[in-house]
């Protein structure tokens, strides 16, 4: 039901001219830094079920309203985001905004309330991060942790393939650099917690509910390539953005 409510809410924002166009938001992706007042809300170590109940209040569904060109209906794409400031300051991936298709971008909380994106505060393509401000949003923020050590337990709450608010567990497996599409290096933190399409922009957090990273992408490892076709999938590496990349975008 939340999924259908999200599309209806985005259509209402568009019809009521209550949102900034996606094309205008994309023009703001050149903003490199912004002053952000973080919501430092401490959480003592908690059981996974209590963590889930608490963190879900800070995790958002992000989505673009678009027309496929093959029918007259609107469609939505879904990604993830999370709150870091009480006045509607959120984090998601740069690539969530940078894709071409779409009229508007919006967000929805776990109770089904829809929010328009007001503006882009800061963004970095290499680190695949964007910090946005939602209009008229008073949400519960997550706090940012220090960098997590390799071997640390981590959790993810995201929306893989429209399966909203799914929680998975793993550990930090390594830190490394990758080359982006423009051949510029970006920092990454690999984890073993599962996620899939629709999880982009989701928080990676520790047992205290503090953010240690942001879901970004996956990289599949195949045993062989025959006639240009990859065969025998062995492993899927989960690449995330380390928390220090968020700190570099914000000016406290």
Language-model segments: what does each one mean?
Residues 1-82, 90, 246-252:
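N-terminal activation segment of mature serine protease catalytic domains
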Residues 52-55, 75, 83-84, 122-126, ...:
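Extracellular/periplasmic catalytic domains that process cell-envelope and extracellular macromolecules
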Residues 57-74, 114, 130-141, 166-251:
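Active-site region of chymotrypsin-like
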């Amino acid at each position: 039901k939340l999924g259908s409510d999200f599309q209806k809410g985005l259509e209402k924002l568009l019809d009521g001219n209550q949102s900034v166009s996606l094309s205008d938001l994309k023009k703001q992706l050149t903003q490199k830094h912004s002053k952000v007042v973080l919501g430092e809300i401490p959480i003592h170590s908690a059981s996974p079920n209590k963590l889930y109940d608490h963190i879900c209040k800070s995790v958002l569904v992000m989505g673009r309203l678009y027309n496929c060109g093959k029918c007259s209906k609107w469609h939505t794409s879904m990604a993830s985001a999370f709150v870091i400031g009480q006045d509607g300051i959120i984090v998601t991936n740069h690539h969530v905004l940078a894709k071409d298709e779409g009229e508007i971008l919006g967000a929805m909380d776990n109770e089904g309330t829809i929010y328009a994106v007001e503006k882009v505060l800061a963004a970095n393509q290499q680190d695949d991060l964007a910090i946005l401000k939602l209009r008229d949003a008073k949400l519960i923020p997550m706090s940012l942790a220090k960098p997590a050590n390799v071997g640390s337990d981590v959790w993810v709450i995201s929306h893989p393939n429209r399966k909203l608010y799914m929680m998975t567990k793993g550990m930090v497996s390594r830190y490394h650099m990758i080359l982006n599409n423009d051949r510029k290096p970006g920092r990454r933190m690999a984890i073993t917690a599962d996620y899939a399409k629709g999880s982009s922009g989701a928080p990676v957090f520790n047992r205290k509910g503090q953010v240690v990273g942001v879901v970004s992408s996956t990289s599949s490892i195949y045993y062989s390539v025959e006639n240009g076709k990859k065969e025998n999938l062995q492993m899927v590496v989960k690449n995330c953005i380390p928390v220090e990349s968020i700190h570099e975008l914000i000016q406290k």
